[in-house]
A protein has these predicted regions:
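Conserved active-site regions of diverse hydrolases
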Residues: 19-320, 325
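Gram-negative bacterial Sec-dependent N-terminal signal peptides
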Residues: 2-20
């Protein structure tokens, strides 16, 4: 039986802090890595990264999940990099916490959030702001690189990253933040870049992903007990597990190989789950956007500031999610 992704997916991680009355979402602020970067690294590198055939400063072949979410909320500033005056602070390559010498010279998620917090120092964070936080994949991949030689240090690095997300949210709550969209990690072992390292690497990466997600869930549970903030969650691990299942609608013919490999590009990116060795295609991102919008609607069944009529998913998202002809 073919299964269709639905809003039920978002309850795979418990929905937290949703008892309060619904309020309008008037702005969207984003912290993250290449899965959410809409052009900050492109600006930082004077247009050198990402190279062609990547789309408009994004590490994919088209709009990212955050583009679809921002469109659905009618909040265009989240589709503009902070380096160009927008509210998207995500940088490709970013880790949650500072790493070793292999860490790219871009702001960590902690630094991104601190920059935003300082910018709101005198005014506070408007309670109608939705803050999206998705990071940790690069911390897990960095830990994987040292796991065989020093597993204890690698696991400590992963826990520190998950704890770092919790610290970011707590600091932003203290600054006035009241509504958050928080995303865990998909199976890092499923990335083509990790598959290429062999089965042991795949198993280690999956284990480290599980460690991160467990610590991440513990952080959210503590925040839910200690604060009154609305913590809306999206289970990226379960989402990618379902997208990798050929019985799921929408389906992808190829869920293991990248569309782009060196100078070679596949004939139809929409049939691939992965655009390159580490990033999803635009079609996969569109599914994520739809699920994020459904998560917001599930948390707030009363009207929130959705741009689309009757809470419909934007056409740009639905067209990408639809089964290819």
């Amino acid at each position: 039986m073919r299964r269709t992704l639905s809003a039920a997916l978002v309850v795979a991680i418990p929905m937290l802090g949703t008892a309060g009355a619904a309020t309008l979402i008037e702005r969207l602020v984003v912290f993250g890595d290449s899965l959410s970067d809409v052009g900050n690294v492109e600006v930082l590198s004077a247009g050198l990264l990402p190279p062609d055939p990547y789309f408009d400063g994004r590490y994919s072949n088209g709009p990212l999940w955050i583009d679809g979410l921002a469109e659905g909320l009618g909040l265009a500033s989240a589709r503009v990099p902070v380096l160009e005056g927008g509210t998207n602070f995500a940088f490709a390559g970013a880790t949650v916490v500072p790493g070793g010498a292999d860490t790219p010279p871009v702001p960590t998620l902690q630094a991104q959030a601190e920059a935003y917090r300082l910018s709101r120092l005198f005014t506070g964070i408007d309670p109608n702001t939705l803050i999206a936080v998705w990071g940790g994949a690069n911390d897990v991949r960095s830990a994987l690189a040292t796991h065989r030689t020093d597993p204890a240090a690698a696991e400590a690095r992963v826990r520190a990253a998950a704890d770092g997300v919790g610290g970011i949210v707590r600091d932003l709550i203290d600054a006035g933040g009241d509504r958050f969209l928080l995303v865990n990690q998909p199976d890092i072992g499923a990335l083509p870049a990790v598959r290429a390292q062999g089965e042991q690497a795949v198993e280690e990466a999956r284990s480290l992903t599980g460690l991160f997600n467990e610590a991440f869930a513990q952080q959210l549970a503590t925040l839910d007990e200690d604060t009154a903030a609305e913590l809306i969650t999206l289970d990226a691990f379960e989402l990618f597990e379902q997208l990798s299942d050929p019985g799921t609608v929408p389906s992808f013919d190829n869920t293991t190989d990248p569309c782009v490999a060196g100078s070679t590009m596949c004939a139809d990116p929409d049939e691939h789950l992965f655009w390159d060795e580490a990033h999803p295609t635009a079609r996969a991102h569109a599914v994520g956007a739809e699920e994020a919008l459904d998560a917001l609607r599930s948390a707030n069944p009363h009207p929130v500031a959705l741009a689309s009529p009757a809470g419909a998913v934007p056409s740009a998202v639905t067209s990408a999610v639809a089964e290819p002809a």
